[in-house]
Structure formats: structure tokens, C-alpha cells
Amino acid sequence: MLSKDIIKLLNEQVNKEMNSSNLYMSMSSWCYTHSLDGAGLFLFDHAAEEYEHAKKLIVFLNENNVPVQLTSISAPEHKFEGLTQIFQKAYEHEQHISESINNIVDHAIKGKDHATFNFLQWYVSEQHEEEVLFKDILDKIELIGNENHGLYLADQYVKGIAKSRKS
């Protein structure tokens, strides 16, 4: 049986994952409207992935006979200065989500909630992967530059990542 504390934290995490999905959808739209179709595709796909993260949490809560408490999702940022800023914000956002997951893991350990701890290990691994991914993209964008041809090359690099993640 899940403790009230874990239930509260998991419900909050569902909403954080939904917010993540909206943020990446907003970033994707900005990229598409600035002819950065590669980054747009990557972020669009990533928005769907974040939505799947929320669904996975919902299923876990439902399996434990816990009602999910969805809250209003605030409007995500939609004005950006450029590709570097988008991926910097995305990287920082992933770090924030990792902190949130780690906090729930800590509570599960303290409460000796082995089932929740085990369930969350997938998220711990996923967050590590996402932080590495976004940091790598950010590093490549900064290396290539985002002026003139560099912006095009950076967009193509991100497009390649998006396509490779689909296969």
C-alpha cells in the first residue's frame, strides 16, 4: 500500500511530466516556425515521450487503486531567443525532473516502499539518459555555433538524433 506522502509525490510527478510534454511541444512549435525542422521533429517526439512518462505513472497509481489527481497545466513558455536557449532550458528542465524523481526515490527508501522504489528505477535510468542527451545536443550546438550555416548544421544534427531514436 502506498503512503499518503508517496501518493502525493507521484501525483505531482504525473503533472510535472504533463507540463514537460507541453513545454517540449511549445519548443517544437517555435522551432518549426523558425524553419528548424530537425529540432522541431526532435522536440515534438520528445513531447510525446514525456506524455508516455505521465501515462506510465498513472498506470502505476491505478494498479495500486490510487486515484490520479490531475491539476491544471500552466501555459509553457513560447518565446525563445534561439536554438541554444531552447536546449539550455530543456537541459535545465531535465535536471529539475531528475531532482524530482530522486526525491520520490528518497521517500520510497525512507518509507521502505520497495515496490515504488523498484518502479522508479526506470525513471532514474531514463532521466540520466535524457540529461546526457540534452547536454550532448547543447554541447554540439555550442561547438557548431548557431549563426548562418552553423544553425543549419546544428538543426541537421538534432534531426539525425530524432530519426535514430525512432529506429
Curated annotation (Swiss-Prot):
Coiled coil: none
Cellular localization per UniProt: Cytoplasm
Gene3D superfamilies according to UniProt: 1.20.1260.10
One term under GO cellular component: cytosol
Residues in the signal sequence: none
Residues the record lists as binding Fe cation 2: E50, E94, Q127
Matching PROSITE patterns: FERRITIN_LIKE
Keywords: Cytoplasm, Iron, Iron storage, Metal-binding, Oxidoreductase
Molecular function in Gene Ontology: ferric iron binding; ferrous iron binding; ferroxidase activity
Other known facts: Was originally thought to be an adhesin.
Entry protein name: Bacterial non-heme ferritin
